[in-house]
Amino acid sequence: MTSSAPQQGDSSRVRDLRIAIVHSFYSSATPSGENQAVADQMAALDRAGLKPHLVAAHTDRLSRSPLYPLRAAVTVGSGRGHSPEADLRRLRPDVVHVHNLFPNFGSAWLSNWDGPIIATVHNYRPLCAAATLYRKGATCTLCPDGDRWAGLRNGCYRQSRTATAPLAWAGRHGAPANPLLRRADRIVVLSEASRQTYVRAGIEPGRLVLVPNFTSDAASPKGVGSGRRHDRVDAPWVFAGRLTPEKGLMELLVRWPASERLDVVGDGPLLEDCRRAAPRAVRFLGAVQYSELRERLPSWRGLVFPSRCPEGAPLIYPEALAAGLPVLAFPGSAVADSVREQGTGMVVGWHEPLDAALSRAADHFHSLRPHCRSVFLRHYTERIWVNRIANVYSDALAHHAAVREVPSGGGPRVPEMEPRW
């Protein structure tokens, strides 16, 4: 399964906890679903009365220093450098929830921290320098399979061996030795595919907890799911995401029928290549404001999701469902798995005639809109997420207390597992 059934947890059990959220924010020059997810989760925890406190590092600010590339490389490679520990000592939280340390926070502080830690893995960075498990048009698992220096040889991070070197060095012992994953009492994954990937890489299954992303229903236009027709016969399809190789847009465009309209929302290094490959019926809208995208989602015929890599759980999927928008996905991603399992659209193979697939999708996507809304309400609302994460916090506290009762000679110890693929 790609999304767990809603848990009827009671967030009041942990309402008096002080929760510290640790996150290294990626550059605002590149729209980040992970940054958005952290902001949404902070707001949701606050509304639920769970007292979250953000401990953050911002690439936008730190990168102004001419020495930033060197400092970031040393931090990533050695685990030493900028640390959230002083802020955490001041806050004295009951639970620390880490979303991202890369590249601005070190990891050395983890061995000094005595309280419960939860880690959310938004991508595959502990297994792959590029964080995508994707290379040269296909899924790549060379590094987690045991060839630890494959990423360095291929310059997988930013197409540069120099930039990849700190990541390769930090990950040379595999995922079980990753300081954050080794230390965490509970590790939150966003999809069943992600959970299975981390288990195969050697992470203890009992510490992995599936908590899918949510999205706020407040951002959905009024009337969505009411039965009122939002899609027109001539409405275009939409792609929304970064224009990078692993997103699959180039492969989609060379197959896209000239008679079908497609709007491309997003920007990235492949923009000009995509423009050259696109038929005339494709419009490039560029990056749009988050609120505008949410407002416009119901007006498209369907979301096209051609990702070529095993993405964890992009926010665009629950956002589409909140808008009552069905999804046309291609195999290989967690979104395709969810579409199959939840019946929220159609999965089409790369070798199938795309014009025929689009015609079939157009015939029944309108009737799927109420169902997509229903799936959103059952699996991806803020309330459901808060209950799930409250259960995780409660379990982490209990686990940490149990571990501390057992003499360990120096803090929590997690059984190591050999990677099995």
Label each region the model flagged.
Residues 36, 40, 235, 239-257, ...:
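A conserved mid-protein helix/loop that constitutes part of the nucleotide-sugar donor-binding site
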Residues 126, 141, 145-222:
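Donor nucleotide-sugar binding/catalytic pocket of nucleotide-sugar-dependent glycosyltransferases
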Residues 272-294:
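Nucleotide-activated donor-binding/catalytic signature segment of Leloir-type glycosyltransferases, i.e.
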Residues 298-312, 325:
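Acidic donor-binding loop of glycosyltransferase active sites
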Residues 305, 317, 322, 326-329:
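Short hydrophobic beta-strand element within catalytic cores of glycosyltransferases
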Residues 317, 331-342, 346-347:
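Short acidic/histidine- and often glycine-rich active-site loop of Leloir-type glycosyltransferases
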Residues 341-352, 359-366:
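Conserved acidic donor-binding segment of nucleotide-sugar-dependent glycosyltransferases
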Residues 366-385, 391:
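A short, well-ordered alpha-helix in the C-terminal region of glycosyltransferases
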